[in-house]
Regions:
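Solvent-exposed, flexible loop/coil residues
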Residues: 16, 52, 60, 142, ...
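A beta-strand edge to alpha-helix "cap/lid" segment located at domain peripheries
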Residues: 2-6, 71-161
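Intrinsic disorder/low-complexity signal
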Residues: 12-13, 18, 29, 48, ...
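A solvent-exposed, acidic/Ser-Thr-rich amphipathic alpha-helical stretch
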Residues: 34-100
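Short, low-complexity N-terminal intrinsically disordered segments enriched in polar/charged residues
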Residues: 1-27, 31, 35-39
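Short linear sequence motifs
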Residues: 18-19, 34, 59, 112, ...
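A structural signal for alpha-helical segments
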Residues: 13, 54-57, 111
Length: 161
């Protein structure tokens, strides 16, 4: 195989690996798999900016918040990433953007949240594995509902920014 063809195949393999990385992270969040979620991020310093949820410089800080806030049976979450745009910069660096549609049913306080936005990510290949080294979530729209008997009350609808 020519060097050019080898490099093209490697680029496609890298794109596919990153296109599997983000859903691995989101599925781990939905299933409350803390170790799997943690493994998708760079082990040492990484930049995580989830806006109002928090900013973190290390994956352990995100794990702490995730464990305290989201890892409960009453938090029924569903993350759906779509429309990925992945750019392989070089052999070990890549960037990407994803659209996100998120739903949360909180059975403890009878609330429902839907959120749309986008992730802007940077990835690093370490020991032949892609990990998230930087991520930012930018919210576009949110619908927050309160369940009151058989009625839904709109708490907020619009742009969270």
């Amino acid at each position: 195989m020519s060097r050019y063809l080898e490099s093209r195949v490697q680029e496609l393999e890298d794109i596919m690996a990153i296109e599997n990385l983000k859903p691995t992270y989101l599925n781990a969040c939905d299933s409350k798999d803390v170790e799997l979620m943690k493994s998708t991020f760079k082990a040492d310093h990484c930049d995580i900016d989830f806006g109002p949820v928090g900013k973190f410089n290390h994956r352990e800080d995100l794990v702490k918040l995730f464990t305290e806030v989201a890892c409960h049976d009453f938090m029924l979450e569903s993350h759906h990433a779509h429309n990925p745009i992945i750019n392989i910069i070089d052999e070990v660096n890549a960037s990407g953007e994803w659209a996100l549609t998120y739903s949360l049913i909180n059975t403890k306080d009878n609330s429902i949240v839907t959120l749309q936005g986008r992730y802007i990510d940077e990835y690093l290949k370490i020991d032949n594995q892609w990990v998230i080294s930087k991520t930012q979530f930018i919210g576009k729209s949110s619908l927050n509902l309160q369940v009151e008997g058989e009625l839904l009350k709109v708490i907020f609808a619009g742009s969270p920014a």
